[in-house]
Amino acid sequence: RLHKSSKCITFSQKNGRKGYDRANFEKYLFEVMMYAGSASLYQELNSTNKLPKIGDLLIIPGYPGHVVIIIDKKTVKGINYYLFANSWMPAQDIEIISGKNPKCRNFGNYTPILSTNDKIYINGYLFNIKTHLRTW
């Protein structure tokens, strides 16, 4: 069960229905998804002025917003290439994003990011690295 205060949301079983049945699980997921979206994630994580690292997120906050996670990085001749993954809805399978890198086809789905001023287009969303990059 969720308990809301002005600053945070906490979970507990107090006054909640106990059990591991599907209906209870779906109610729990519904509550989590109501509060754990791209807008709250964007606010809770730290911004950075450095180039991305594995595990960092690109977040467009909103309702709906969108999030991609950096799952790998290659550096070749001083250029950083990144591999991204995302999911279209909470609790769906994660997919590796097809990169568009016509200059270096041998890097497959990896996308270059040269500076924090770069903007990259992923799955219909334009991410500004300086604005949208968040780190743990």
Question: What is the role of each PLM region?
Answer:
Residues 1-53, 59-67, 71-72, 80, ...:
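Acidic/His-rich structured neighborhood in mature extracellular/periplasmic domains
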Residues 72-73, 133:
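Short amphipathic beta-strand and strand-loop transition segments with alternating hydrophobic
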Residues 76:
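Surface-exposed substrate-engagement region within the catalytic domains
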